[in-house]
Amino acid sequence: MHNLVILGASGSIGQSTLKVLRRNPGRWQVLALTAARSVDAMVRDCLEFSPRFAVMVDEAAATALAGQLKTHGSATRVLSGQAALCEVAAHPDAHSVMAAIVGAAGLAPTMAAVRAGKRILLANKEALVMSGAFFMEAVREHGAELLPIDSEHNAIFQCLPEAIQRQPGYCDLAGAGISRILLTGSGGPFRYTDINALAQVTPAQAIAHPNWSMGAKISVDSATMINKGLEYIEARWLFNAAPEQIQVVIHPQSVIHSMVQYKDGSVMAQLGNPDMCTPIAHALAYPARVESGVEPLDFFSVGEFSFIRPDYERYPCLALAMSACQQGQAATTALNAANEEAVAAFLAERIGFMDIARVNEATMVALGSSPVGSLDDLIALDGAARARAHNLIEELS
């Protein structure tokens, strides 16, 4: 049986992964589930899936989980801390690792899985945004297999020739007859909102995505469209694409998840209802296909497809991310760190919606040209960018 580790089991992607497993009993064995501090969810899922290991980042949460599992007679071994995350991600019995921890916190365990040569189901886009070339070099050096979970990158992956699928990060798009990648995005909940009203947007409004059901952080990222900017950077590394080979297209219906345009004029697109269970099922079973539980697309009810050019005045964070991709690794690392801090401050109602872009830009300008020669340099830069962003947030609060 295929052993699976789910990093970030209590989050949106982790829960969708478990949903796909329920649709396909007996195909995968859950080796480990991890979470930060969601004890109740972990008790429920450990009792259902009987993993060998359960890891809580928070030590008090681990103690609480261990006590409750013991009461239920569970044999699951409970571990705690960042080192334990890395340990289960690289466990000799693990075949695939779902990397679904949100943000920079997911980099270390994801990299541990890469260095152990695992099949990585990559939902943590920040790992690539933060570490780019270092991450892809580790994938190649250690023989890891990389399968994208983001709906857009999974769609692009499915539209590429099999030879390209087998060597992400080191493929030759032009040599395979590909002219460009068309990266689609819904435009978020404010694509038609008066620009002058965006400063008054509340967290509750920002997390109400019109098409997708997602966590709070990624919902805000979608509203600012920095999510699409981070995906632009991720696509650059995943598919060895030059920035000019990637075009962002706003597609409000969220039915076409992305496209690949070939030099002969053909365009390959991957379509489906907006549900993360589809790309998760694809990556879990690749190259086979399994039930995802997602309703088949009904073309007659969709009605129409529309496409809009991005408005960078409305979406300054998207422009910042694309600029960071041109600048290089330090800029993307600084931007990602600043954005995590800024979004957390916005959700806590400490800064306004448009302040997110201000914090991101000021941090990127200050630190985006820092020298980075190693992963340790990137981690240090991440910390410096967070400190800088924190100071800016204090000034704006």
Swiss-Prot record:
1-deoxy-D-xylulose 5-phosphate binds at residues 125, 151-152, 186, 209, 222, 227-228, 231. Keywords: Isoprene biosynthesis, Manganese, Metal-binding, NADP, Oxidoreductase. GO terms for molecular function: 1-deoxy-D-xylulose-5-phosphate reductoisomerase activity; manganese ion binding; NADPH binding. This is 1-deoxy-D-xylulose 5-phosphate reductoisomerase. GO terms for biological process: isopentenyl diphosphate biosynthetic process, methylerythritol 4-phosphate pathway involved in terpenoid biosynthetic process. Its EC number is 1.1.1.267. Its cofactor is Mg(2+); Mn(2+). It catalyses: 2-C-methyl-D-erythritol 4-phosphate + NADP(+) = 1-deoxy-D-xylulose 5-phosphate + NADPH + H(+). Catalyzes the NADPH-dependent rearrangement and reduction of 1-deoxy-D-xylulose-5-phosphate (DXP) to 2-C-methyl-D-erythritol 4-phosphate (MEP). The gene is dxr. Belongs to the DXR family.
